[in-house]
Every structure is written in C-alpha cells, then in structure tokens.
C-alpha cells in the first residue's frame, strides 16, 4: 500500500526525476478548493495503483521553485512523469473515473 509522498523543492529531483517508476505529481495549495476535492481521490488512487504508479503532492506556496519549471499556471495540476520526463498533464479537479482513465491511457 503506497502512501502519498510529500514533495518539496529540495526532494523533487531525488523523488520524482530519479524515480524508475511512473510518478504522478499533484501541484496544489491549501487555499485551493478543487485541490481539497481531489485529495481523497488521490489517496484512493495511490492505494489502487500502488504497483503501477507513485503519487506525490507538492504545495506550490511552500515550494515556489518547482512549479514554474513545469509552467504550472493553475491548480490542481497533475503531471505524470516517467524517466524524468513529463508524459501527460491533467489540469483541474477530476473524478476518480477520469483519473483512472488518464492513468490507464498513459501507463499501460
């Protein structure tokens, strides 16, 4: 059972870019209501897809340096990484079904 990894500007490269697994990163902020809606969905996905993808969250207010590198302009934004490259992007709060379809299309 995977737990969601708390990402920071300091550990982003080590955790995400150096990962040998698919890595889904949620760019979020405390004040963002759609981010709060997405949070429990990500918890469920991290458990259901634990053998396929690692899930991490990066608070853009506490970690202001990473989001601009990936041109994050609105939140929540989900980036799916593989071998240090962005494979796919999903912007906005999505349903669990939409997120599962997004992952299945990109990691299978």
Curated annotation (Swiss-Prot):
UniProt xrefs under InterPro entries: Thioredoxin (IPR005746), Thioredoxin-like_sf (IPR036249), Thioredoxin_domain (IPR013766)
Listed GO CC annotations: cytosol
GO molecular function (one): protein-disulfide reductase activity
Source superkingdom: Bacteria
Annotated Thioredoxin domain residues: 2-108
Protein family: Belongs to the thioredoxin family.
UniProt name for this protein: Thioredoxin
Organism: Buchnera aphidicola subsp. Acyrthosiphon pisum (strain APS) (Acyrthosiphon pisum symbiotic bacterium)
Gene giving rise to this polypeptide: trxA
